[in-house]
Amino acid sequence: MDINQGCCGFVVGLIEAFMLLEQESINKVVLLNADVLSRKVSKRDRNSNPLIGDAATITIVEKSMEPVVIHGLLKMDGTNADALMIPAGGFRLPASDDTRQMIEDEAGNFRSQDNLVMKGDEVFNFVQREVPPMIENLLHVAGSSKERVDWYMFHQPNRFMLHKLADKLGVPREKMPSNIVENFGNASGATIPTNIGFNLGDRLMREQYVFCLAGFGVGLTWGALLLNIGNLSFNEIIYY
């Protein structure tokens, strides 16, 4: 099964994995999240290129012998899809010699229609407007509170956005790590599992924590999960 969901991909992938595990014949799901954004962003795009990275993650999700309750929310709104998209390459505008032509924007960035376009202000405003109330709603539905969450592991476009999200949610910044872009770059749907592996490492092989996971981006799509993660068989970063 191949799901194209960009920066919300890990959350969407986990939701799909949980639904698959509801089937009696399925006991284990291997979830692969990978993106090679460096091939989608123009090298002459000073707005996006410095933040981009490539990564692939593997998450093995197994059926539990004990009842497990996981709360999740997923939302989509296509009215602002052009805030974060690759204009060409689909049926509406197939890739061609014309779409490969580089065009300079008002800020001096050069992109073709085959390159990723990220309207930073619009994406930032969307995240600050939509994500905090989604998290508040998720916690309300789960009968939980912000204080009972140990870690807020969110998709990481940049440190500034994560700091503003933490402040708006009223949670300590140290509970919402924001150091992935500076170490690995923004690798789209792979940033959340990279975040977990890099910041918690083998601690998750010995301990269990309450996590709030959130992804947001292309679509525009945003989603969140509230769940326990811990006592893992492995949790490591492999550099290449």
Give the role of each language-model region.
Residues I3-S25, Q128, P132, D150-Y240:
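Claisen-condensing/thiolase-fold acyl-transfer catalytic domains that form or cleave C-C bonds
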Residues N4, V29-D35, V61, L73, ...:
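Short beta-strand segments
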Residues G9-V12, L37-V41, G78-A81:
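Short, well-ordered, mixed-charge alpha-helical segments that flank or form enzyme active sites
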